[in-house]
Amino acid sequence: MKLKEINRTAIQAWSPAQQHPIYLAAGTSAQQLDATFSTNASLEIFELDLADSALAMKSCGSFSSPHRYHKLVWGPHGIENQGLPSGVLIAGGENGNIILYDASKIIAGDSEVIISQSEKHTGAVRALDVNSFQSNLVASGGNESEIYIWDLNNFSSPMTPGPKTQPQEDISCVAWNKQVQHILASASPSGKASVWDLRKNDLIIKVSDHSNRMHCSGLAWNPEVATQLVLASEDDRMPVIQMWDLRFATSPLKVLENHTRGILAIAWSVADPELLLSCGKDNRILCWNPNTAEVLYELPTSTQWCFDIQWCPRNPAVLSAAAFDGHISIYSIMGGSNDNANNLQADQLSSSFGNVDPFGTGKTLPPLQLPQQTSPQSTITPLKKPPKWIRRPVGASFAFGGKLVTLDNIKPTAQQPQQTAAHVVHISQVVTETDFIHRSNQLQTTLNAGNFLEYCQNKIETVQNEFERTVWSFLKVNFEEDARLKYLELLGYEKEELALKIASALEGNCKPKEADMDKEEVLAEEEAESDLDDIPVNEEEPVVEETSNTEVPPAPASDAINLKVSQDIDGLITQALLTGDYEAAVNLCLHDNRMADGIILAIAGGPELLAKTQRKYFSKTESKISKLISAVVMKDWLDILETCDLQNWKEALAAVMTYAKPEEFSALCGLLGSRLESSEDVELQAQACLCYICAGTVEQLVSFWTKTQDSCSPLSLQELVEKVVVLQRAVEKAQGAVPADMGALLAEKMNQYASLLASQGSLQTAISYLPTNTEQVSVQQLRERLSRALGQHQHLQQPAAAVTGIQKMHQRRPAAVPMQTYTQPQPPQVPAQPAAPAVPPQYYQQGRSATTVTSWSNQTPTALPSVPRQLVPSSDPQGDSTPPAFGLQSPAMASVPASTPFMYSQQYQNYPPVQQFTPSAGTPGIYQPLPYASSAGAPLPPPPSSSSSAAVYPPQFMLSASSQASAPPQSFCPPPAVSSGGCFQHGGPGSPTSYLPPPGARAPGTQHEPALIPASQRTDGFYQETAWGLEGPQNGWNDPPALSRAAKKKKVPQHFTPPAPITAPIMAPLGDPQAPAGMQTLQPQQQVPDQSAGPATFTPIQQQPLGPRNPSMPQGNMEGAPGAPIGDVIKPLQAIPTEKITKKPIPEEHMVLKTTFEGLIQKCLTAASDPQTKRKLDDAHKRLELLYDKLREQTLSPAIIGGLHNMAQSIECRSYADGLNIHTHIVSNSNFSETSAFMPVLKVVLTQANKLGV
């Protein structure tokens, strides 16, 4: 973009970087004439004012000179000591003269501006340069190989860098080295460049391209690499720029070719060594990257040659070009538009002529009628890459999850200047709240382990506040036996101490009541008792003594009973009793204030009369403890809690602990807490927290805590979450169910807590604390961000695919054979489509299995193995280690207790659910044994509806035997395995649908193979002979598959269609550690009706352990596809035609594994120097192909693939120790035969990477 313009045919020089404002000096060129053909010469200084919209630059000073100039430079000498405020202008003249000008005096308009001058050179001085380290040193070059070094402090006596070069020739340019101050280079038109060392005062090297003689027009040193320089060629036959390195001076390092005619001038940017300007006879100004020989930018210029070009030292984006058309143009390489400059030029032309006829008629010209043309705005493309001065050398930015992303541009070393600069981005985890994270980790550990008693006890011992200690004591009680009794002890009521007081009172150790002691003293003595339970004992003490210690002597036998029927009270009572009117007798006793007699009679009168009498008694009796006794007897504690003095809150809470029913306990404690919270006494308000803990009302606890505590600080919020989580687990333990939905206030606090955890990098923990049953926008947004950060976003959004139906295949079996019955755990049932047949349940987490369609299996989907299951299901749901959801799960999750979470179960990929495949008519199915229902009509569980979304489970294993006890049992026993005699199940949930166990040796007398005989031609006896007569070696669960001996071919039925080739893994190993234990029961096998054979179906079934063989067990006939293998006895099928097998591509979601592992091996190979280490790495690179094959075939379980993805992430973070920990976890929790081919290789690679520090 053109910024400014000077109408001069002149040599130019920019003011030094130390000078402000920016000036440009223009001296009349020696070998050129302007349009006026004037022979006058001048030296002018112009100011660069970019704020001025005018195109012309403002002239600040001018000096008429008798000299014309070949070269002009502006040095900073004298600026620092203010001797020369604007520096010194150094001019090279036509007659060998060098003139020093005071730039500040030229600007000021003084007439005496010359500091000094010399005519030592012979001929014109065409080369000048100022030393960048010592600004008082100036090099000049003239004719006859003259080179002088001038000291501006002593200008009269210059020195030479060494003897003149031979043969003598003109010096076209000189340049000081930008890195080493005593190195000077000079060049001559013949194309030779000489490098001088001023310390040695001698020439050290000559640079010349002997193969191509070029006319040198420019010389420039690399601003950063001391040994590199460029030479420009003016020859039209070779318009190139050669880049030389003095260390390899035999030939050019690079040749920059793009000009079509000779190059007149070059300039290397000091601010960015990757910017080199050149101008040539082809009217072009190019900006190069000399390191790559690429043209980064071409300036829009006129149709005239530019003979000089220079960078502005102060503003690195500005440059100037002097052209033969009499203009010095100022450009910016940052792009922009030239429309403004063009408009200004048009306006200037119009103002010059005005509206008067230029032919002298004096008449005003009419306006020019031109068609309106809307020309598009001309926009100049900026540089292809940002220049160095606007590139940030360093940068930092915070990212979600407490990550700090920093970058720095590493400067290339002098030894490797041609290499592209490395751009390093560091991603660091920043933890600012270390105490908060430490306590959060402790809580997380407790949630996983379930040791809440230990956690609460640790809190009691470590907290400093006495009230906090009391709170944690109350929370701890929830996890102990007989919680109410422990609550009473915390309130100060211990049974042992109370028993001692009562015993002392009964023995008469208490102060006896004197006859003259009035009622007031008695009450005062009772008030001295601290325990509320002692008060009714003291009131009832005379009754106790009268009834228990006083023996009533029997009436003398001679005394007759006198039943008075007089009209006094006794007589009326007697009459009422004689007639059986208990109620009247009780009323008379109460009227006569004979309370004891009335209550005794009411007991005999029945419960209704007793309750009525109790009410009347309490209405008449007014004492300190009458309300308490009334509440105890009437079991009505609501009135006590609503009216009691809040100073006696402990006594009221103790009474609730003792007498409240379980269903009303929580409400009563909450009522007392609400009264305490609304109290004006601050100390009483704090006690409301204890009541809410006893009540188990989490929302009230959160509301109270929010009002009284500073919940803005992370530690305060951590304290609240600790109490809430522990209390929720306590309520869950007490009620045996998941608590109610989370309220708005608690959801807000949990969202705030999850945000804090996420800001410290604990993303997995943070998402577990987010509520799942709230519609708050902030919660949903945070869940979205966390899901994306953890790679679970696609998994959360993908709906469940429709599950196709399967066809049943019935098989005949003897009725009297005892069977093992496998009870399959049933997931939560989802209504199925009416038209879809029943399918067996799936025993794996939704969204973690995928289908694999091979080219040989009639497009039969093969389910991936499921997530590993625990060996021994937990019998205690409360003891299970669950992820820290602390009762916040959805109801769908609540019915399936969780097992121990997989350590590295981050959702790396979302697999679609498994779809069952139904073979079409005439399609041979791959045989797989099916489970037999206990009765013919017992249907299998319905499949999930295609319209319902897949349940979203957290990354944990949802299998538990105790939770599925009600599942309908299914009997299963395929034909006996080779030499085993037990029930063997070929597969498991998500296991491959085809398999080929090694055939055993044939027993003597066996003549036929039942696998190759149609079902219609088999007999029970024949099948029994062939199936039970086979013996063979029994392999261990982890033995590799044995090589099968070639079997003798038998005759195949005429219309037999061979099954599809077997492409999936052979079979699950025996004793699969993933198989759930404790789920087999023995039941007698029921008779299955014989039905016609149907096509084979593909049903995932559970693997069974081998049992002892009973040779006497009879065998039945089994219908199936012709040639379908029976049990384990599967013989080779027809020979498959040989064809070329091409490997399938690795799935796109797993390509990151290959890229990461191979990239790490390449880094290790680069860093390794030991041949033995390199051999190990080469071998590892080859053996990893086994892993890639398994990825292609998708035969690895999701748990192993998840671990591999976590390992790849640790490699990308260069955390090899974590990668080795993940490796150990995968090996210890997976099938050995599944991982033995590649896991040792990965361990070698990780160990070497950690050792080499790559």
Swiss-Prot record:
Stretches the record annotates as Disordered: 364-386, 818-892, 983-1008, 1058-1125
Polar residues composition bias: residue spans: 847-863, 872-881
Annotated membrane topology: Peripheral membrane protein
Example of a GO MF term: structural molecule activity
WD repeat extents: 4-47, 64-111, 120-160, 166-206, 209-254, 258-298, 301-341, 397-428
Family: Belongs to the WD repeat SEC31 family.
Name of the protein in its database record: Protein transport protein Sec31A
Gene: sec31a
